[in-house]
């Protein structure tokens, strides 16, 4: 959808007393048939509706917060496989402690640790000095649908692949 108050990324909702944040890249068809239960979208976008559908599926499967987060994220990946059948579905999902990604066609990740250096954006004449923006204890993750910087090792997530990391 276009850029309106109802369509901005990322989207945030509450499930199990925790905030969940979601961003999606791609286009889905037939997404209006997804059942969202009590978790309602504000707008009409495929992104927000698919997020509400994912949270509804999680709530149905896990009425209480799951103890097995690895198992929960495997279930999320299965749900993403279903959404992938509707079109391109690259996504990022986080509860502030864990970050999960799912790739339909193009998704990359990078991890940066001290000693931090500078990184130059590929599509802009901009250089970021991560040493000025971080501490020696920080670990910085980047997730994007295309590599953003040169002279760094970005890792490609294979189509149909999911990834997760613990950041909390």
Question: Where in the sequence are the language-model features?
Answer:
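N-terminal segments that mediate ammonia production and transfer
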Residues: 1-168
